[in-house]
Amino acid sequence: SKGGGCCKTPEGNYLLGPSAKEVWNKEDTSCDAEGIAYALSCCQHKGVGEKDVIRSFAGVRAADFKEDFIIEKSEVTAGLIHVAGIQSPGLSAAPAIAKMVENILLEEMKKEGMSYKRKENYQPYRPKRRVFRKLSLEEQNKLIKENPDYGQIVCRCEFITKGEILDAIDSPVVPTSVDAIKRRTRAGMGRCQGGFCLPVVLQILAQAQQQDCTEIDFTAKDTNILEKIKN
């Protein structure tokens, strides 16, 4: 896949890279000096330097040697549909890929004699979340009067309130980690990368889910930040 891009996020941050470096270990998501230098070189015209970088990360793309998408039912496992090898056009192709998967699924259900119908109360859209920092001063004051949690700034870098974090926790798909809260609300996404707000987010998440702080994960399962001290 191609590498070496420079794009601006809706929030105003720049994303640099990737390097598109091939690795042999599928678990290797490390960053190295060579890759970071290459990513920085992709955005020299924007005057971005090392001092401006607040986080570096890497991922591994499971590309196919045929350089093509794999969208098909499994020949081994019943009920499994492969959607793999999705590369650069994946975002643009997502609606069409979803339709292909739907057609494969319906075809397989038909073969098995299974019936189906559209869910009557299906809601394809989720309510738009309130972004406190984008509201006018009058709207902010009104919201704080209705719910004082919106008057408590948890993440100072991104101006994220306790109310927004609780809204995210109260969503149909419940975030269960600090990283999930960051992705939903941007708390911890700023310059300090959670250095200030992480302990508060951890506490809010633990209280909302009636868990101990030592049970809250940072990212995936069993990545808890705190550990109980055994006497």
Enumerate the predicted regions with their spans:
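Short helix-coil junctions and helix-kink-helix linkers
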Residues: 184-188
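Intrinsic disorder at enzyme termini
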Residues: 108, 130-138, 212-231
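Iron-sulfur (Fe-S) cluster-binding segments and ferredoxin-like electron-carrier domains
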Residues: 27, 161-172, 195-213
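C-terminal catalytic lobe of FAD-dependent flavoproteins
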Residues: 1-11, 22-153, 160-171, 189
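Short cysteine clusters
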Residues: 155-157, 192, 197
